[in-house]
Amino acid sequence: MADNAYKEYEKKLYSYADNALLTEEVVNDLFKELLTVLPNKGKLYKYKALSTFHIDELEEKYIWFSSAKKLNDKKDCAFNANSLKEIESMVKFFLTDDNYRKTLVNGYYLQLLSRCPEITHKAIEDCLLCVTKNGQRIGKLKFDKFCKEYKLTTEQKQVLINTIQLYSDEAQNEGVIRNSISNLHKQMQEVRNSMQICSLTTSYDKDSMWAYYCNNAGVCIEYDFNKINDYELKKKFINTQKVRYGRKKKFSYVDIIKAKLENTQEAMAKADEMILSQLLTKEKSWRAEEEWRTIGSVRGNETGIKIYADIVSAIYLDYSILKEEKAKQIIELAEDNKWKVYVRYFSDYEAEYRYDTIENISKLISDLKQII
């Protein structure tokens, strides 16, 4: 039942492929539905070693989204495609049915859409045809009129000039097309590296993650999505999705281009689903992590970004670090912000890790000292 509800949420999320459709009402509805499919009534967790934990995350109340380039698995977020074979498939596709020109028009349309919602494919095509088919004077008049009407920036004007040059090649020969997509492998890497990922999990008591990420000497932070009220934050966090485990499907750039050219809501949703499937699928060996991830994208950023969100609700610390200065700072910050603090400790009598409030642990230590 829960899986079906999640799949319905994912399907609904993908149906809003155009960001312009994400009105405040739509975002609020999506976020409300997300809260119903998240585990633990909207709470997710992040494990961190004390040695590498940045205390300012708690002081400034931000969540770190890491570039996919920094992920601990090079396969993670990589597209399951052979770039050399993809180039050949794309060349063949572009040489058929004037698809190269159609793609140029669509690419420029997508660049202008956010700033010029009234722009149409036909308006761009008419401009390109007029400039390339008529003399220099008429072509320049059309170019200037188009730039003025849609208030193009200097950068957008230059992109239009480059598009005109490619569009005007009557032969549409293989050499021109091959040259224009020759850096596909580099582009694939840039797309991956510009993805910003926040990886979370379903619980605080995963011994394997305490060992792998914290070396049994770290913290686990609890994030409560119910504390998100801001529209812009909701818009970011509606992209929180469940990671799938198994073999990635083969990825085809031609299929994405076809969907973009079709330009229907259904086709765009399918394209988004194909791309996100690559970003959300990991090998079965990672299954125990039960990961949920929030995905964003910042072109050119291969480091990561801070997302300011005051959504911490509890912090779990391993008993071994309680005397560390950084741990004391964390506890003090938790008290100031009314976050719950729990301690993870190993029970020799039960041969199990247990969790209790820091108040109870402190009382127990105090009582033991009195006995001794």
Regions found by a protein language model. Name each.
Residues M1-I372:
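Partner-binding and oligomerization surfaces adjacent to conserved cores of proteins
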